[in-house]
Amino acid sequence: MSITFGELVGNFILVTGSVIVLLLLIKKFAWGAIESILQTRSQQISRDIDQAEQSRLSAQQLETKSQANLDASRSQASKIISDAKEIGQLQGDKLVAEATDEAKRLKEKALTDIEQSKSDAISAVKTEMSDLTVLLAEKIMGANLDKTAQSQLIDSYLDDLGEA
């Protein structure tokens, strides 16, 4: 099967003519609809791109706002913790100061009680000594002394004991 040059040119002209006729028919009947579909699709793609850009900007703003809120929350939490530590330190210092004051008060009371006990003991010893001195003096003198003489004797004896 061999094709001649004339047949080849004829087929070429026929196919080319058919394509041209087909393009003319498409342009006349379908090109408006195809162009309309392509333009509608182009507009839809543009709207989708614009919406995507707006969504991205909105998400970026929301992220910035959320980050600012998070930073503010962290700052507040840090301040609350700092304030709690400071209050705890102040309360601890107050408790230590109160305990120190209470210890000083108890120490002073104990010293006062000791001084009072010492004074009471010395007074009791003096009384006992005076009674013993009177008894001893009565035995030595063989007679009872009147109250004035007893008092003078006791005072002089105690003064001698105090100096010794």
From Swiss-Prot:
Its main location: membrane. It is a single-pass membrane protein. Keywords: ATP synthesis, Cell membrane, CF(0), Hydrogen ion transport, Ion transport, Membrane, Transmembrane, Transmembrane helix, Transport. GO terms for molecular function: proton-transporting ATP synthase activity, rotational mechanism; proton-transporting ATPase activity, rotational mechanism. SUPFAM superfamilies: F1F0 ATP synthase subunit B, membrane domain (SSF81573). GO terms for cellular component: plasma membrane; proton-transporting ATP synthase complex. InterPro entries: ATP_synth_B-like_membr_sf (IPR028987), ATP_synth_b/b'su_bac/chlpt (IPR002146), ATP_synth_F0_bsu_bac (IPR005864), ATP_synthase_B_chain (IPR050059). The chain crosses the membrane at residues 6-26. It is found in: Cell membrane. NCBIfam families: ATP_synt_b (TIGR01144). F-type ATPases have 2 components, F(1) - the catalytic core - and F(0) - the membrane proton channel. F(1) has five subunits: alpha(3), beta(3), gamma(1), delta(1), epsilon(1). F(0) has three main subunits: a(1), b(2) and c(10-14). The alpha and beta chains form an alternating ring which encloses part of the gamma chain. F(1) is attached to F(0) by a central stalk formed by the gamma and epsilon chains, while a peripheral stalk is formed by the delta and b chains. F(1)F(0) ATP synthase produces ATP from ADP in the presence of a proton or sodium gradient. F-type ATPases consist of two structural domains, F(1) containing the extramembraneous catalytic core and F(0) containing the membrane proton channel, linked together by a central stalk and a peripheral stalk. During catalysis, ATP synthesis in the catalytic domain of F(1) is coupled via a rotary mechanism of the central stalk subunits to proton translocation. Component of the F(0) channel, it forms part of the peripheral stalk, linking F(1) to F(0). Belongs to the ATPase B chain family. This is ATP synthase subunit b. It comes from Streptococcus pyogenes serotype M5 (strain Manfredo). The gene is atpF.
